[in-house]
């Protein structure tokens, strides 16, 4: 009898502890929705609440701590620590924790997890009916059995309302588009998101009339994606109204569509730039920052970068360099090339992360990063590296790349001197509007460096340099 009583008391105690742990976890989620912690004390308070909840075996808290360790959010970035928290939550049958372990293993983020272990965790998450895990698993099955993958995705939407699964069915070119569209038509009769997707499908086929019809139905029922597609349709219509399109983006954002929040913010920043009064400028910019903050917290990487810029330069908000750099770091960690480049420029040249960030941005096609990498390679006397980056930039028609190559071949930096090629490169740079090249070509044609002397051509380039306020050219009479 007493044993039964003790067991009942233990169950009640465990239930109370679990309820308290859940309350701590929910409090953290509410704080996160309000924005990034402003001070170290606020950040530590959020971490402490999660740790307390995790210690009481509340799996979602353990999983969130693991995610923060992966991102370096309030905690030191540490994959081993993240794995420990994920494993703790996985033992408590938390589907998301299994999925996070699968991600780490499949992406080779840690030697602690083999591919086989990653797949096992993915299957565990699928068995726990985690919608995102089913989505990932279905994508893995595409090569082996596309029909089975399609059915998994379709069922994942019909049973779990996993919107990305249905969206993938529309976007993946390997599925029969007619079959997918017929399925959408059936679902759309009673489903506003399917209606929105059908509109998007028609939009990608340039059938604006059909896209308008279904997007209008979806937006009338306040479907966020439907409002977004309705905005896209309005932008593409022959007599589309930009103001109306912005209203649909704002409506989509209000209903939780993150991409719309970002796009609406971009439009507002443009409006702020062109505003005729300071009051309107502040009004547009402030609303833009609110939308960017919402999208950034939700993980939208371009929004994180844009928010960083607003905070760094005090646009629509008080200037806050620390927060700005923090958002810049988050965007850079998620491979945003502009963020990687700007973060590298903020770091001293000797900093261990300066060159890797610069290199990563250049690899993604960031033209300024390419030029900086070429200069770095020149300083290292690495002709092959310097030429590689300049030629990559030249392929993208970057004027400065032609100019720097012209300098290299004129001065014999890392390459043999070739005055004729140098003159041709300066000419190409000038054709692309490079002001310094106008002045270089003036000297080239004046003195006959790699070309025949030509006073008329020299005078033409000197005039172009002067028209573009080239300092040295301004004082020359020719």
Regions found by a protein language model. Give the residues of each.
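Hydrophobic face of amphipathic alpha-helices that form TPR/SEL1-like repeat modules
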Residues: 27-34, 64-71, 101-108, 136-143, ...
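Residue-level detector of the short coil/turn that links helix A to helix B
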Residues: 73, 77, 113, 144-145, ...
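TPR/TPR-like (Sel1-like) alpha-helical repeat modules
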Residues: 154-159, 453-470
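TPR alpha-solenoid repeat register
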Residues: 23, 61, 97, 133, ...
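Short helix-capping/linker turns of helical repeat alpha-solenoids
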Residues: 17-20, 34-35, 56-58, 71-73, ...
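Alpha-helical segment of the N-proximal tetratricopeptide repeat
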Residues: 22-41, 52, 56, 200-201
């Amino acid at each position: 009898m007493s044993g039964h009583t003790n067991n009942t008391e233990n169950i009640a105690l465990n239930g109370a502890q679990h309820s308290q742990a859940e309350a701590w976890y929910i409090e953290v989620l509410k704080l996160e929705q309000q924005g990034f912690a402003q001070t170290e004390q606020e950040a530590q308070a959020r971490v402490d609440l999660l740790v307390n909840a995790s210690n009481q075996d509340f799996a979602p808290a353990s999983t969130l701590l693991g995610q923060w360790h992966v991102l370096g959010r309030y905690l030191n970035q540490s994959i081993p620590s993240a794995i420990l928290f994920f494993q703790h939550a996985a033992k408590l049958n938390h589907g998301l924790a299994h999925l996070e372990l699968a991600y780490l293993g499949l992406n080779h983020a840690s030697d602690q997890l083999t591919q086989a272990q990653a797949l096992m965790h993915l299957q565990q998450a699928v068995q726990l009916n985690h919608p995102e895990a089913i989505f990932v698993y279905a994508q893995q099955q595409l090569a082996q059995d596309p029909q089975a993958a399609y059915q998994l995705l379709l069922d994942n939407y019909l049973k779990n309302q996993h919107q990305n699964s249905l969206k993938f069915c529309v976007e993946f070119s390997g599925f029969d588009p007619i079959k997918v569209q017929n399925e959408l038509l059936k679902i759309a009769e009673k489903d506003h998101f399917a209606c929105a997707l059908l509109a998007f499908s028609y939009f990608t086929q340039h059938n604006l009339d059909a896209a308008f019809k279904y997007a209008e139905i979806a937006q009338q029922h306040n479907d966020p994606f439907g409002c977004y597609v309705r905005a896209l349709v309005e932008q593409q219509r022959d007599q589309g109204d930009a103001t109306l399109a912005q209203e649909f983006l704002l409506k989509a954002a209000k209903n939780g569509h993150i991409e719309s929040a970002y796009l609406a913010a971009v439009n507002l920043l443009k409006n702020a730039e062109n505003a005729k009064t300071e009051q309107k400028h502040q009004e547009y910019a402030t609303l833009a920052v609110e939308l960017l903050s919402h999208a950034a917290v939700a993980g939208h990487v371009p929004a994180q970068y844009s928010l960083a810029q607003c905070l760094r330069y005090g646009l629509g908000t008080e200037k806050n360099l620390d927060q700005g750099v923090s958002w810049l770091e988050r965007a850079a960690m998620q491979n945003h090339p502009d963020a990687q480049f700007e973060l590298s420029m903020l770091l001293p040249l000797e900093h261990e992360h300066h060159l890797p960030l610069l290199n990563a941005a250049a690899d993604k096609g960031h033209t300024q990063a390419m030029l900086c990498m070429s200069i770095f390679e020149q300083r290292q006397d690495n002709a092959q590296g310097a030429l590689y980056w300049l030629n990559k930039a030249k392929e993208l028609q970057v004027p400065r790349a032609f100019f720097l190559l012209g300098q290299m071949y004129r001065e014999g930096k890392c390459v043999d001197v070739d005055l004729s090629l140098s003159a041709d490169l300066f000419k190409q740079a000038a054709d692309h509007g490079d002001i310094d090249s106008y002045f270089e070509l003036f000297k080239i044609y004046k003195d006959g460096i790699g070309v025949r002397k030509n006073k008329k051509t020299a005078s033409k380039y000197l005039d172009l340099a002067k028209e573009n306020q080239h300092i040295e050219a301004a004082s020359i009479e020719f």
